[in-house]
Amino acid sequence: VDLDRYAGRWYEIASIPNRFQRHCLGNTVASYRPVEEQRIEVINSCLDKDGSLDTAQGIARIVDTGSNAKLEVSFVSLFGWHLFWGDYWVLELADDYSYVIVGTPNYRYGWILSRTPELSTEIRQYLDERLRASGYDPAVFVETPQGLQ
């Protein structure tokens, strides 16, 4: 994974429901920016149930420097020290960096992200095949609405 190419804005197309996003109605976006060697700033945002924009800022660190495809992310810091790291594995990445499947080794979490708010039916079907090949059940992924007001 080329971190400079991976940087930027990603729209959440679908995800496995999880406790830390349960307040999100949609418009979920992740933004990544390299900040130092082996570290990436992460800013996630979504439309909250109360109509406000909810934002979470964290940091990702590379744990597999050979591929840059295995990272850990933390959104909890205490006195500048990040705590509670979670796995963030790039399982499938388009050659042109237009879409990505992110998951965890225990299959508990998963996301389909895209550079655009929507994916074609053909690409989505392909990604469902890639999810199966990675050990995921595509049926547990819930579509994320984009463009909500």
Short names for language-model regions:
Residues V1-Q149:
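A beta-rich soluble binding module of mature secreted/lumenal proteins
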